[in-house]
Design a protein with these regions (language model features):
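N-terminal subdomain of nucleotide-sugar transferases
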Residues: 1-38, 44-64
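Short N-terminal targeting/anchoring amphipathic segment
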Residues: 4, 55-77, 94, 127-129
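Short glycine-/acidic-enriched loop or helix-start segments at secondary-structure transitions
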Residues: 15-16, 76-80, 103-104
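Short, well-ordered alpha-helix to beta-strand connector turns
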Residues: 25-26, 64, 88-89, 125-126
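Short, conserved loop/helix-junction motifs that constitute active-site signature segments
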Residues: 82-88, 121-124
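Acceptor-binding helix/loop patch of EC 2.4 sugar-transfer enzymes
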Residues: 89, 93-116
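Membrane-proximal helix-turn-helix segments that form the acceptor-binding/catalytic region
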Residues: 111-128
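Carbohydrate-associated surface elements
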Residues: 134
């Protein structure tokens, strides 16, 4: 099985998770990642940036059997921007953490826009996985 993995924050524990899993997997993984920098900016623009990259790879003949992404990607936006071949793939989203339950410095600091992005991502996915019962 060929899996397209999209990680907008490809660093730290996000990178360690994907690198570890893909290295031990029997499947073929193709990673598209963005540097681990300014997570809010990554959540805002990753779908646009990654959709362009995905389209370019399809133009070069790439195909996949499944799509895997983390909670840092707005999957609903991405699916609206990619070619139909990608929209038809079964999509799994992995919540490494989520912005609804992630501890905020103060409740007044919580930006619910990012929690809503996580919600729309979950609704757009065929399967939703969490790293713990907490998240």
């Amino acid at each position: 099985m060929k899996i397209l993995a999209l990680e907008p924050y490809f660093g730290g524990s996000h990178k360690a998770f994907l690198d570890g899993w893909s290295a031990r997997s029997q499947h073929e993984w193709e990673m598209i990642g963005l540097p681990a920098y300014k997570w809010k900016w990554r959540m805002r623009h990753a779908a646009i940036t990654m959709a362009d990259d995905v389209a370019a790879r399809i133009g070069e003949g790439a195909t996949w059997d499944a799509l895997f992404c983390s909670d840092m990607l707005n999957l609903a936006e991405l699916l609206g921007l990619v070619p139909e071949a990608v929209r038809r793939l079964p999509a799994v989203v992995y919540f490494h953490e989520n912005q609804l339950t992630y501890p905020a410095a103060a409740e007044t600091d919580r930006d619910l826009h990012f929690a809503f992005t996580n919600l729309t991502t979950a609704l757009a996915a065929d399967s939703v996985w969490f790293n713990s019962k907490y998240h």
